[in-house]
Amino acid sequence: MGSGASAEDKELAKRSKELEKKLQEDADKEAKTVKLLLLGAGESGKSTIVKQMKIIHQDGYSPEECLEYKAIIYGNVLQSILAIIRAMPTLGIDYAEVSCVDNGRQLNNLADSIEEGTMPPELVEVIRKLWKDGGVQACFDRAAEYQLNDSASYYLNQLDRITAPDYLPNEQDVLRSRVKTTGIIETKFSVKDLNFRMFDVGGQRSERKKWIHCFEGVTCIIFCAALSAYDMVLVEDDEVNRMHESLHLFNSICNHKFFAATSIVLFLNKKDLFEEKIKKVHLSICFPEYDGNNSYEDAGNYIKSQFLDLNMRKDVKEIYSHMTCATDTQNVKFVFDAVTDIIIKENLKDCGLF
């Protein structure tokens, strides 16, 4: 009888040990899991960062996956040229070539009749003629005064390549494609022995109420703000400057009680577009009090200080910031490595090892 009880005890002890081991494994896994929230106003580059994670930390895009973006890219091209020609009357701009009046009409007719995501030869020809027109180019130069995709000139300048019969989108084409994020998109990948769960949340105002249940147990927030948006207005509200909206949103996040213990990293994104724009448009259009040099460095540092000065807990909470170009894989790789090191350092600090 005694030996029976002993065997039972041994079995219980064995099970208990297995359970302890399992709990320890789960705890170790949990400790190595980083929950990363990508936040920011609409069109600040969050989804492009997610695509870069696939390129850098997963296996990138297979030819089959690249092909799936073809229809999206064609849709972006059509939306872009339509946005430009529809803005011309509002801005009081005429076509330089009289023949383009007919081309504009033809474009509108074709846009209504073609299958979405396709690019028939007659449409390509009309877009090519319109894009060459001086009036269309003048309207494109004033893109901040209406809503236009950042990738418009990238695609329209390469119309022949992307409309060739054997066209297969490359990684840069995929990175520059634009689809509005609705809901929450999760991406999983591993870096430096850490398991990342990255959540990309729609940035438009209507999407933001979906963020709240993502807040639980967040390790790090990457907040994306578009540097180049300083002279632009929101898609949802043409009375609100995009940079002001971004600052307002950052203020509510960096000082939120939910994020008292969360690392916050600021990505001042679209530095390439900002570098071009700042040569032509003074920063005082957004910040009337700014009287510094209208150089990339000075204006960029001023914007950075506007964000960082919003942090009410500077004495205990450091906010890390980086100038980024989300379409530049090497830049994103370098910056994300730095972010990973910050997360490791903060984790060690929490454990009292730093």
From Swiss-Prot:
This is Guanine nucleotide-binding protein G(t) subunit alpha-2. G proteins are composed of 3 units; alpha, beta and gamma. The alpha chain contains the guanine nucleotide binding site. Residues 173-181 are annotated as: G2 motif. Residues 265-272 are annotated as: G4 motif. The gene is GNAT2. The lineage of its organism: Eukaryota, Metazoa, Chordata, Craniata, Vertebrata. A lipid is attached at residue 2 (N-myristoyl glycine). GTP binds at residues 40-47, 175-181, 200-204, 269-272, 326. It comes from Bos taurus (Bovine). Keywords: Cell projection, GTP-binding, Lipoprotein, Magnesium, Metal-binding, Myristate, Nucleotide-binding, Sensory transduction, Transducer, Vision. One of its GO terms (biological process) is detection of chemical stimulus involved in sensory perception of bitter taste. Residues 1-27 are annotated as: Disordered. Residues 32-354 form the G-alpha domain. Guanine nucleotide-binding proteins (G proteins) are involved as modulators or transducers in various transmembrane signaling systems. Transducin is an amplifier and one of the transducers of a visual impulse that performs the coupling between rhodopsin and cGMP-phosphodiesterase. GO terms for cellular component: cytoplasm; heterotrimeric G-protein complex; photoreceptor inner segment; photoreceptor outer segment; photoreceptor outer segment membrane; synapse. Residues 324-329 are annotated as: G5 motif. Mg(2+) binds at residues 47, 181. It is found in: Cell projection, Cilium, Photoreceptor outer segment; Photoreceptor inner segment. Residues 196-205 are annotated as: G3 motif. It comes from the Eukaryota. SUPFAM superfamilies: P-loop containing nucleoside triphosphate hydrolases, Transducin (alpha subunit), insertion domain. Belongs to the G-alpha family. G(i/o/t/z) subfamily. Residues 7-27 have a biased composition (Basic and acidic residues). Residues 35-48 are annotated as: G1 motif. PROSITE patterns: G_ALPHA. The keyword DNA damage does not apply.
